[in-house]
């Protein structure tokens, strides 16, 4: 994997970043570079979560402004770090946990906001549904939307994706 060859400083006009599943070294490097540059970012460990140890995961949480993951990854993060979701959320501006057919939850400012599922007209292709959700999350953060609006937008985009076949 060559993601570590890319550097935050080489890109222009970055105001928000995401560290998503990629090569281990690249994820660590990009988190450090976003933090050093003062650029807020979302830590989205996804299927890459198991390759990090407790201290590395706590470092990601310390550097990140936000974190997003599904409920399985959230449980694994709790187990690997020994921290509760409330503890983890307390270190972030927001922790977003998607729960499949049960919608999602946003932990922010000591509050827990339940975001209802937007039901798709039909299930055509779930591939990319999480990515679509993340795009709504990033758009809401970038636009300064409140968390309920951001979560509802993210859920809507996930539903639109699941109802359509796409690349």
Give each language-model segment a name.
Residues 81-167:
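Conserved phosphate-binding/catalytic region of the ribokinase-like
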């Amino acid at each position: 994997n060559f993601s570590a060859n890319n550097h935050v400083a080489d890109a222009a006009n970055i105001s928000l970043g995401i560290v998503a599943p990629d090569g281990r070294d690249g994820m660590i490097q990009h988190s450090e570079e976003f933090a050093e540059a003062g650029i807020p970012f979302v830590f989205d460990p996804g299927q890459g979560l198991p390759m990090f140890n407790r201290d590395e995961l706590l470092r990601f949480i310390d550097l990140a402004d936000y974190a997003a993951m599904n409920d399985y990854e959230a449980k694994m993060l709790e187990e690997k770090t020994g921290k509760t979701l409330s503890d983890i959320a307390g270190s972030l501006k927001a922790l977003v946990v998607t729960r499949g057919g049960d919608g999602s939850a946003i932990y922010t400012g000591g509050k827990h906001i339940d975001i209802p599922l937007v039901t798709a007209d039909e299930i055509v292709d779930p591939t990319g549904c999480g990515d679509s959700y993340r795009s709504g999350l990033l758009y809401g953060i970038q636009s300064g939307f409140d968390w309920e609006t951001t979560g509802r937008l993210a859920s809507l985009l996930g539903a639109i994706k699941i109802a359509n076949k796409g690349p």
